[in-house]
Amino acid sequence: YVHAQDRLFQMDLARRQASGRLSEVVGEAGLENDKKFLVFSLRKAAEESYKDYSDEAKKILENYAQGVNSFIEEAKRDNKLPYEFSLLGYSPENWTPIDSLTVGKYMAYDLGGHWDHLGFNNWILNNLGEENLKQLLPDSFSKNKDNEEIIKANQGIDVSIR
């Protein structure tokens, strides 16, 4: 309840962003983001992982969702939804345990520093070679004067791109 009371709009945007549904409320500006997160399938991963949670953990997630939904119902009833919902012209949907897990997976992605491209670059280097890496990703090399040293340091490092 209290989390929603203080952060409902941010929670809703995080849920939408992680689920690939941001464009539903911000329009075309959210389409590229939606495409990316639909490919990442964080929501599907949350749905799959939920099956493996203990009954106790599921109950905690359900209680949390119930608290969020209590605030949503109260705020709708009393016309006290955060003003951002009015600005964008929509009301929040009820919260689910899957929403919590999806946002958690999004936070792990977001706080992880988006290192996925570095792993991919390293994979190209070690599987296709330095010249192919420079041809495939020329912009990466024109910006950093230390690239030759970085390439040498990264050669032979085993990296998975999955």
Per-region residue spans from a language model:
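Substrate-recognition/specificity elements adjacent to catalytic centers across diverse enzyme folds
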Residues: Y1-R162
